[in-house]
Amino acid sequence: MAKDKASRRPRAETPKGFRDYFGADVTERKAMLDAVAEVYHRYGFDPLETSAVETVEALGKFLPDVDRPNEGVFGWQDEDGDWLALRYDLTAPLARVAAQFRNDLPSPYRRYAMGPVWRNEKPGPGRFRQFYQCDADTVGSASVAADAEICAMLSDALEVVGIPRGDYIVRVNNRKVLNGVMEVAGVLDPSDPAKFEAERGIVLRAIDKIDRLGKTGVRALLGAGRKDESGDFTKGAGLSDEQAEVVMGFMAAKRDTGAATAARLRELVGASTLGCEGVQELETIAELLDAQGYGPDRIVVDPSVVRGLGYYTGPVFEAELTFEILDEKGRKRQFGSVAGGGRYDDLVKRFTGQSVPATGVSIGVDRLLAALRAKGRAGAEAQGPVVVTVMDRDRMGDYMAMVGELRRAGLRAELYLGNPKNFGNQLKYADARKSPVAVIQGSDEATRGVVVLKDLVLGAQIAAGASLEEWKSRPAQVEVPRADLVRAVQDMLS
């Protein structure tokens, strides 16, 4: 008879698109985020923690005629018939908080948030359904000083976690300038908002592919279209040659100085009121940053930044790491973007009907941590705790006292809690824990009032071929008075 399926043991496996974080992965991420939080705190930003679960209505998702919410979120229906979902970013919860507590929060409201988000998307290599975000936003200020502050804060955050100047650049652009350029080129008609948005979207999707397709590929997509290597044809935006060249000119407008870049942008936007407003905002941001000591070696106006132009309403910024790494095929490439943000002035409007200006930035936590590992600032093998071994079951109190003394001195220590019968297994455990020191005291050592300290790091070095002189100058095992346990361990660790 077939085995009863109900009695089958559950499989111990992580769901597709999810992963577990162990030891150093957790501590390194926490250390990095703590450093970033300290920067945000100095800038006057307050921490905010929101529920992992939001109403689908608050998230801005709609409910199609199916049994679950729109693809992209993990959602379910509760007993009251309300649709709930795990948050897919940290911005949507901020919008809800800003609307719900608008009479209690200061205005402007500066907040930062860090935590996991969930997206119901097809997983793949390096693409997970749960990942960490680190956001900082200012809600309630229309001043571009708020945008400049976000850029400066982002620069400081990158440096404090270990990305030196010269290895990163924060690039700033403005959606208003691109809109002005397209208006002058005759691509957009501001009097028809629906058509304006549709046509702008087509152009944005084309220029957003600049990194992958290059200038030639984007130029083709701005025109009739592009045929790829497989022969598949992608219909283009249908711009005339003159219109396409104006848009391409916008992306190539960067000059050696911010002033020269702004001058070129003014030429491109011509008489467009919106475009001139965008150029003025970029000039003001550059001036405010320069007044604080943030020069073009750290933050620069760069019209080639196109990511997010379809989402933001004004200035946009992107932090790019400029040092080289080797990809999976051994080829050199720049590390690339680790953070992005911008101004989005419709944050709270759908809740209250009133426009509330906002600007912010989001750091890709996993990408930034990967960058630190590539720079050797993270990923080093973490040191484990000092392990106090057990030689006599009847003296557990003595061993616990040793552990307590070490901990009170600020040292990481633990007592071996496995079966103490086989001492070799205790040392194997200490090795598996990457312990630097093992504390040993049998009945003979206890009678003489001493303990034995085994330097496991040096022992490993000797096993790997340390010289005789090195071994003699620092023996891998020493005997010290019991009263000197803490000092001796501290000396060995130093």
From Swiss-Prot:
It holds the Pfam family HGTP_anticodon. SUPFAM superfamilies: Class II aaRS ABD-related (SSF52954), Class II aaRS and biotin synthetases (SSF55681). Keywords: Aminoacyl-tRNA synthetase, ATP-binding, Cytoplasm, Ligase, Nucleotide-binding, Protein biosynthesis. It is found in: Cytoplasm. It comes from the Bacteria. GO terms for molecular function: ATP binding; histidine-tRNA ligase activity. InterPro entries: aa-tRNA-synth_II, aa-tRNA-synth_II/BPL/LPL, Anticodon-bd, Anticodon-bd_dom_sf, His-tRNA-ligase, HisRS-like_core, HisRS/HisZ, HisRS_anticodon. It catalyses: tRNA(His) + L-histidine + ATP = L-histidyl-tRNA(His) + AMP + diphosphate + H(+). Disulfide bonds: none annotated. CDD domains: HisRS-like_core, HisRS_anticodon. Its EC number is 6.1.1.21. Signal peptide: none annotated. It is an enzyme of class 6 (ligase). GO terms for cellular component: cytoplasm. Belongs to the class-II aminoacyl-tRNA synthetase family. Homodimer. This is Histidine--tRNA ligase. The lineage of its organism: Bacteria, Pseudomonadati, Pseudomonadota, Alphaproteobacteria, Rhodobacterales.
